Amino acid sequence: MKTTILILLILGLGINAKSLEERKSEEEKVFHLLGKIIHHVGNFVYGFSHVFGDDQQDNGKFYGHYAEDNGKHWYDTGDQ
């Protein structure tokens, strides 16, 4: 009787341990997916801010060129 109870207890603990491992792997998958989503949202916000010129306002810079320059560059507003 004691042996049967002991065997059932050991089997039960094994099943619980397996289900804990399965839950852990599912949680890791969810956290990995959330991390990817957050990363992509951050990239989108970063690109969006550059497209619409938030850097120009935030850093006090303008996008333009001097007469002697061939291309356009970022300049400090103090250089005008």
UniProtKB/Swiss-Prot annotation:
InterPro entries: Clavanin. The modification Phenylalanine amide is found at F52. Residues 1-19 form the signal peptide. It is found in: Secreted. Keywords: Amidation, Antibiotic, Antimicrobial, Secreted, Signal. One of its GO terms (cellular component) is extracellular region. Its main location: secreted. Residues 20-29, 54-80 form a propeptide. Pfam families: Clavanin (PF05452). Hemocytes and pharyngeal tissues. One of its GO terms (biological process) is defense response to bacterium. Has antimicrobial activity against E.coli, L.monocytogenes and C.albicans. This is Clavanin-C.
